[in-house]
Design a protein with these regions (language model features):
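Non-catalytic C-terminal accessory domains or segments of carbohydrate-active enzymes
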Residues: 121-173
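Active-site-proximal substrate-binding groove within the catalytic cores of carbohydrate-active enzymes
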Residues: 1-109, 122-140
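Short beta-strand segments within Ig-like beta-sandwich modules, predominantly Fibronectin type-III
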Residues: 113-116
Length: 173
């Protein structure tokens, strides 16, 4: 039986690579947290994926998916293939992204924040065979940003439209 961290890693790898999605579990008896994982994978994304460390490691640990829907953003995955918890660091430049400031949201935990090449995202004690799954959006001054949700692993295709319009001004006399 796979641990929750291992199920999340397997789901992340399949989702990020657009792999075949086969749900062979008995869905009516599946625990709610695992059913939620399956739900977050649909619809399947069929976009080109970049495996960043394809030739650098026995088990690639960094995957990048570029999304262009209602806006442009990146989905990054970082894996811990070790048999014990490890700290993971996600630096946008190491994922071959432009240096700059970004907002992020981690899918499995809901953690949100900001990062840059000088201030990468740090995750403490990622479980053995676990992963982090991040939506990364460039920070634009004076502009509202959608950070993501837990509806779909991409943290963005669930949006039909994102409007960044100033609030109407009201004059009080």
């Amino acid at each position: 039986r796979l641990s929750l961290a291992e199920v999340r890693s397997l789901a992340t790898a399949i989702a990020m690579t657009g792999g075949a999605l086969l749900l062979s579990d008995d869905l009516p008896v599946l625990p709610a947290e695992r059913l939620r994982i399956a739900e977050a994978l649909i619809p399947v994304i069929n976009e080109p994926v970049r495996i960043i460390d394809w030739f650098d490691a026995e088990m690639p640990a960094r995957i990048r998916l570029d999304m262009v829907e209602t806006e442009s953003w990146h989905v990054l995955a970082g894996f811990n293939w070790a048999d014990q918890p490890v700290d993971l660091q996600i630096d946008p430049v190491e994922y071959h992204l432009e240096a700059g400031h970004y907002f992020y949201r981690e899918f499995w935990s809901g953690q949100i924040g900001e990062c840059s090449e000088k201030d990468p995202i740090r995750f403490r004690a990622v479980p053995a065979h676990g992963c982090v799954l991040i939506a990364l959006r460039r920070k634009v001054a004076e502009k509202a940003a959608y950070l993501g949700s837990d509806l779909h692993f991409s943290q963005g295709i669930e949006l039909a439209e994102w409007l960044d319009e100033p609030a109407p001004s009201h004059q009080v006399e």
